[in-house]
């Protein structure tokens, strides 16, 4: 038996934030990131709508990029003191991911990260609170997914938590929030969304339920990402919806080694998640094409790329990704990103071992061992061809 899970309600469109005034509840904890939502006036809007709904609100502010276990535990403690019946997270992937993990430890203070680090080990939630997510970036799609990524900086380990219990109850996908993204963030989050859609389409758990969502997302991202990077508002809106569709796909089909690699190098080398995915994606497509040639070729055909054979179509898809990276000033290798060679050599065995153990590796369409993972990392560092 397989399962397909989404939030109960997704409100979308410009101005959909207003839906918050219809929320039923008594107390809400609002979890925020670095301050951009306040600067652009969206926090005041949310507070105003929640006041109309008669809901008392407290804020948790300053969730850092790649949130830490410490941030999660502090937030969970504040929730236990305030006892909200709604947890509302607004911002990029980081505050929403952090709020999901806070939710777990708010409802289950006896648990530790070791208890929930394996997929589908999160206990039942919603005994104390429901969860509403409002994304401001067009990439992570954590507003519709069963995932949350939390970092333990002391051990340099990223925990990709995975459980349908942490799928939000409500998502508000208002593209006005995404209009505030700077170009670099637009590029990184957009490539994250493209990676989500492509990996979901070839993942071992892809299905007739996830394939249309993934393919529609790929088509929309192909059409709108670069225009969005250049600041086109209509393209920003379409990218906000595309990343959400990609999220619905990968939350159910799961991902692959592009994300495994990004998780582990994000923790060790501090590469922004979307940037890491963008760098790895061409190399991973090449590696996986040994077993998924037809699936990748189908993507290339659907977006009208050149090629008379499956091999030529897949090469066109790889070149499309490379061209997008180039146009949006994303490095093509880890060396170009700025990681020193000796540091890479010192850490490559560690990150290879950890990437093999990542939750996303199991659903990659081509299975691999630590030595093969290391070889891919080396190809990505030096920019050499994946020919194995």
Swiss-Prot record:
GO MF assignments: alcohol dehydrogenase (NAD+) activity; metal ion binding
Enzyme Commission number(s) from the entry = 1.1.1.-
Pfam families, sorted: ADH_Fe_C (PF25137), Fe-ADH (PF00465)
Coiled-coil residues: none
Q: Which residues cross the membrane?
A: none
Which key words are in the record?
NADP, Oxidoreductase
Q: Which residue positions does the secretion signal occupy?
A: none
Q: Which InterPro entries match?
A: ADH_Fe/GldA, ADH_Fe_C, ADH_Fe_CS, Alcohol_dehydrogenase_Fe, NADPH_BDH
Lineage, top-rank taxon, reads Bacteria
Question: In UniProt terms, what function does this protein have?
Answer: This enzyme has activity using butanol and ethanol as substrates.
Q: What family is it from?
A: Belongs to the iron-containing alcohol dehydrogenase family.
Protein name according to UniProt: NADPH-dependent butanol dehydrogenase
Organism annotation: Clostridium saccharobutylicum
* High-level lineage: Bacteria, Bacillati, Bacillota, Clostridia, Eubacteriales
